[in-house]
Amino acid sequence: MKKFISLILAISFIFAAPTMCFAESGTNSLAENKEEASSTQPDFGFSVRGALLMEARTGAVIFAENEYFAASPASVTKIMTLLLVCEALEEGRFSLSDKVTISSHAASMGGSQVFLEEGEQMSVEELIKCTVIASANDAAVALAELTAGSESAFVGMMNKRASELGLKSTAFENATGLDDTVTDHYSCAMDIAVMSRELIGHDIILKYSSLWQDTIRDGSFTLTNTNRLVRYYEGCNGLKTGSTDKAGYCVSTTAVRGDMQLIAVIMGAESRDERNAAARALLDYGFASYGLYKAEESFVENIPVVGGTCYQLPVYSTPFVTLVDRGGLSRVEQVYDIPESLSTPLAAGERVGQVKYMLDGQELGCSELIVKEECPRITLLQIFLRALSLIFCGKIL
């Protein structure tokens, strides 16, 4: 009888919820920094049609002025052209080494070009290089024809992709941005920044957009970057310029310093110098005023498990990154929402809590607390066997 009672008590002990308490919520304050950052957007006095500064990793907008004003983007159009080509490469529809035979239509393109001739053959990688560095219209059309069969079919892909990206003030009529005959070809600073952010995720783009000069045709033809900031601005690694009488001077400029990549878009400047000065001013402001707050994946603590085959599981926080004014980087606090115990069954990767990141009482965002191991619910047979081992061995085996 005594052993029967002991068995019942042992089972109750095994299945009961643990009473030990872990911090339900807490803060992990970083060093105090009394410097306050201004929330007022600066007035640069730009005389441009639109301007925007975005941090690439988070997509956070730092500065915006007439960011949805739709206008001709000129050759900045090729950001979408190159994006579709890169995505086709990823899908395996062709390779960088594939040779492309230039059509009469591609060879007929005016404006910026590398003077491709009908019937000439050039590799996909060389055509990308020509488009990225020299803004070559003939190379861009050759890539469009390779990707979709014709430039007109490619334009359909461009507009479809714009819709998928949620671009509200963008429409295309060609793959180049030549705008002397188009009537419905436009974009805005915000949409161009979104496209740019997608494009720089493809390594081959920054490989070439960061170069001041390169060559094609066995070194006999020199390509010079249309983006002078690549040569003269610290950290500039792209991306695309454009200018026509209708568009004025446009650019989507990317630059990286440390762990932060910025995208500065200028639409409709009156001169090349004004365009470059405006882009520089935005980039200078962004690098001087903002930084990335990052929390890497980390172990938090072991949490007891109720009714599972395991007794506790380690809990981890997922990575988190956000843009913060430099004056606030040292004041970000982590507030943990951690359960006292975990209920089964638990799957690997399951969310069990969260970490909130706070700055001066404002929530910046949150990351998840997860378990990396699964833990099934314990069966009655397993409970019984554990109880027996506790009674007869003095411990659970």
Region annotations inferred by a language model:
Residues L167-A171, T183-L397:
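Domain-terminus/edge residues, biased toward the C-terminal soluble/receptor-binding domains
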Residues K2-F22:
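Sec-dependent N-terminal signal peptides of Gram-positive bacterial secreted proteins and lipoproteins
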Residues F13, M20-S38, E297-I303, L390-G394:
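Intrinsically disordered, low-complexity repeat and linker tracts
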Residues M1-K2, P73, V124, R377-F384:
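Structural motif marking the loop-to-transmembrane transition
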Residues L9, A37-S39, C250:
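A generic local structural motif
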Residues C21-V194, L199-D203:
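Active-site-adjacent loops and short helices of periplasmic peptidoglycan-processing enzymes
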Residues A10, N159, L283-F287:
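Generic solvent-exposed, charged/amphipathic alpha-helical segments
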